[in-house]
Amino acid sequence: MKRIALTFLLAALAGCTLEPTHTGATRDDGPGGPLPSDPDKIADARPRSEPLNPGANAPYTALGRKYVPYQSLRPYRQRGLASWYGRKFHGKPTSSGERYDMYAMTAAHTILPIPSYARVTNLSNGRSVVVRINDRGPFHPERIIDLSYVAAYKLGYVAAGSTHVEVEAILPRT
């Protein structure tokens, strides 16, 4: 009887891990090869005037929820949870039709126009980056933005998987 109990105990412990679980990323979703020599030197996205992508800004449904993206640039500010996406999507098409580059300063947002630009500030450490919105997501009820791997790296939350941020749309100067 003791052997059976010990076997079940060992089997249960085998499923345990000492590594923290991540809310927004898996342990192996980061770079598959070497990082760029200094990711901190990758420049933020530079806001510029671009025509909006009609197909990427049409209303859509994801996971049973309807989204209606903004049809023009307008003020936007929201606080919430940011996550990041990496190697699993690297090289795959984004909602804009561009290929996802985990080393570019880009992000996915459910309703900000594609393309548009936003300043994202990590509320836990004050770091801030500017990203270009070129994809849709995240489709998780508590998350407001999905950043590229390098944007999350620069904000200091890759290991955590997610963090609390403020997202503010950057409007063109008139």
Stretches found by the model and what they are:
Residues 16-174:
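Secreted/periplasmic proteins
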Residues 1-14:
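Sec-dependent bacterial lipoprotein signal peptides
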